[in-house]
From Swiss-Prot:
Keywords: 2Fe-2S, Amino-acid biosynthesis, Branched-chain amino acid biosynthesis, Iron, Iron-sulfur, Lyase, Magnesium, Metal-binding
One GO MF term: magnesium ion binding
Residues with the N6-carboxylysine modification: 124
SUPFAM superfamilies per UniProt: IlvD/EDD N-terminal domain-like, LeuD/IlvD-like
EC number(s) per entry: 4.2.1.9
Entry protein name: Dihydroxy-acid dehydratase 3
GO cellular component: cytosol
PANTHER family: D-XYLONATE DEHYDRATASE, D-XYLONATE DEHYDRATASE YAGF-RELATED
Catalytic activity: (2R)-2,3-dihydroxy-3-methylbutanoate = 3-methyl-2-oxobutanoate + H2O; (2R,3R)-2,3-dihydroxy-3-methylpentanoate = (S)-3-methyl-2-oxopentanoate + H2O
Cofactor: [2Fe-2S] cluster; Mg(2+)
Gene assigned in the entry: ilvD3
Pfam family, one: ILVD_EDD_N
Binding site for [2Fe-2S] cluster: 122, 197
Note describing how the cofactor binds: Binds 1 [2Fe-2S] cluster per subunit. This cluster acts as a Lewis acid cofactor.
Length: 613
């Protein structure tokens, strides 16, 4: 049996100094020899998805103590992508993923913790902690803060708006027909409670994926932050982590370790879920990164393969008026996985931290299986409270009925899928030989084939300027380059450009392609993650204004219609220039911290992880 890692600092004469310090934190003789459980919290007053997490660490800690473990809590940073959006703050978002992963690794290894509970929620925090868990490979349970309630419907300028969210507010700000009073009405309704933004954006997508990976408990991705039912998830996480720690250290059961739970089959399941639910394109970036951290065989080719055979079964905001509370009412992640299981598109022989196999989990938690437990039925009745609040567990409202409509409800079956192929696709071509990502769940099928002239800009700020300056016309392809992991640096999200296109009435008439990335709130013909990026010598850096760009989803291609000989001439000219593969006229402050990230960052097809010599 493997010894407790913490014995290094709790057992033997040589550990006297460390034990003295442990005692100063409150430990006693009876604690030495028990598994020390690190609780990685991410509470901050900057982020609505984390503002309510201040006390939940103690809920987990109490459960750990009761189960026979020794809890020790610490905190990571957390960047709010929405607040950082549209200015220099967004340069720090993706690099913060690496800082979070490093900080968790540092704390856990420096203090020889035996197990880990990750209390995450928003965009880069769950991926950062996931990367750390895959690196550390010690017993780990994820429990997130939960989704925000959707904003309530409002009337703006005589037009009824569907339940609102962050994207509604951003799009309205670019719509000149919306008055200041109307915009204020939308803004005040859009984000009514604590929790991760209410649509199938990056945060909620990743929290759903941790369920599919087997590292989080049932309901983790969809139970609202405000609902009393979520408290039980934190309590159970504390019990489960001690159980799996004991199975590893006392029974030599390696099946509970993250790399054996979230193995190659589990990553395939997670991506099948992502494709089926039309998740954020950022999930591609983050799953690729996590797989690399865990040395799991999972790459962009695997994602492409999955996207070709898994149908799109659910469309949630920003792609419909459904929000996470509606996904929950329809049975949450187990219901989507259940439909994939019935379609033969799931590996059910993988394990989870809470149930021996995925097969057994879905038998008792899929509300459409006919065998769902009373616990599952009870959980998925949890409904929004409809009250503005930053308090977790503050409502106990219940839906009067569940949404089990597989033909036209929030979650459909394969026979009634939105599209035969999934909501995310990998495109390739001369402009993206190493791949690019498109969220097809966010566009109409009549846009699956598109061609138009390039309008080239070399920063997100310039993109916003040309859109708001009415320089983009129907049929144009806006090319935003030098916004990749190294070129940005930091691979900014292009939420403002896409939201402003939508607000200007161009969301279905133009395309936007970039070596940057998109918010989970992005919709429209928005292609990101173009690899190689411009700063790494990618062809996107050679595109000129007026070049014809062709997009064809059916053939999975993205091309600039310029002869190879012409591209070769442009490349030679670029290489001979004074500042090759750099933006010509961009005013941007790049700090030492960002330059350090840029020096090591890989392109998006590698997950934008750091390449360390």
């Amino acid at each position: 049996m493997p010894p407790l890692r913490s014995r290094t600092t709790t057992a033997g004469r040589n550990a006297a100094g460390a034990r003295a310090l442990w005692r100063a934190t409150g430990l006693t003789d009876s604690d030495f020899g028990k598994p020390i459980v690190a609780i990685a919290n991410s509470y901050t007053q900057f982020v609505p998805g984390h503002v309510h997490l201040k006390d939940v660490g103690e809920i987990v800690a109490e459960a750990v103590r009761a189960a026979g473990g020794v809890p020790r809590e610490f905190h990571t940073i957390a960047v709010d992508d929405g607040i950082a959006m549209g200015h220099g703050g967004m340069l720090y978002s993706l690099p913060s993923r690496e800082i979070i992963a490093d900080s968790v690794e540092y704390m856990v290894n420096a203090h020889t913790a035996d197990a880990l509970v990750c209390i995450s929620n928003c965009d880069k925090i769950t991926p950062g902690m996931l990367n750390a868990a895959m690196r550390l490979n010690i017993p780990t349970v994820f429990v997130s803060g939960g989704p925000m309630e959707a904003g309530k419907a409002v009337v703006v300028g005589g037009v009824a708006q569907a339940p609102t969210d962050l994207i509604t507010a951003i799009s309205a700000s670019a719509n000149s027909s919306v008055t200041d009073e109307g915009l204020s009405e939308v803004e005040r309704s859009a984000c009514p409670t604590c929790g991760s933004c209410s649509g199938m954006f990056t945060a909620n997508s990743m929290n759903c994926l941790t369920e599919a990976l087997g590292l989080a408990l049932p309901g983790n991705g969809s139970t609202l932050a405000t609902h009393a039912a979520r408290r039980a998830l934190f309590e159970k996480a504390g019990r489960v982590v001690v159980d799996i720690a004991n199975r590893w250290y006392r029974e030599d059961d390696a099946s509970v370790l993250p790399r054996n739970v979230a193995n190659a089959k589990a990553f395939r399941n997670a991506m099948a879920l992502d494709v089926a639910m039309g998740g954020s394109t950022n999930t591609v970036l983050h799953t690729l990164a996590a797989a690399q951290e865990g040395e799991i065989d999972f790459d962009l080719e695997t994602i492409d393969e999955i996207s070709r055979k898994v149908p799109c079964l659910s469309k949630v905001s920003p792609n419909s008026d459904y929000h996470m509370e509606d996904v929950h009412r329809a049975g949450g992640i187990p219901a989507i996985l259940g439909e994939l299981r019935r379609a033969g598109l799931l590996h059910t022989d993988v394990t989870t931290v809470h149930t021996p196999t995925l097969e057994e989990w879905l038998d008792t938690w899929d509300i459409r299986s006919g065998k769902a437990s009373a616990e599952a039925i009870e959980l998925f009745h949890a409904a929004p409270g409809g009250v503005r609040t930053t308090e977790p567990f503050s409502t106990d409202n219940r839906w009067s009925s569940l949404d089990t409509d597989a033909a036209g409800g929030c979650i459909r079956d394969k026979e009634h899928a939105y599209t035969v192929e999934g909501g995310l696709v990998v495109l390739r071509g001369n402009i993206a030989p190493d791949g690019a990502i498109l969220k097809t769940a966010g566009i109409d099928e009549d846009l699956f084939s598109f061609q138009g002239p390039a309008v080239v800009v070399e920063s997100q700020e310039e993109a916003v300027s040309v859109i708001l300056g009415k320089k983009i016309k129907p049929g144009d392809v806006l090319v935003v380059r030098y916004e990749g992991p190294a070129g940005g640096p930091g691979m900014q999200e292009m939420l403002h450009p896409t939201a402003f296109l939508k607000g200007a009435g161009l969301g279905k008439q133009c395309a936007l392609i970039t070596d940057g990335r998109f918010s989970g709130g992005t919709s429209g013909l928005s292609i990101g993650h173009i690899s190689p990026e411009a700063a790494s010598g990618g062809v996107i850096g050679l595109v000129e204004n007026g070049d014809q760009i062709r997009i064809d989803v059916a053939t999975r291609t993205l091309e600039v219609l310029v002869d190879d000989a012409v591209l070769a001439e442009r490349r030679a000219k670029m290489e001979a220039s004074e500042r090759p593969w750099q933006p010509v006229d961009r005013d941007r402050t790049v700090t030492t911290a960002l330059r350090a990230y840029a020096a090591l960052a890989t392109s998006a097809d590698k997950g934008a992880v750091r390449r360390v010599p």
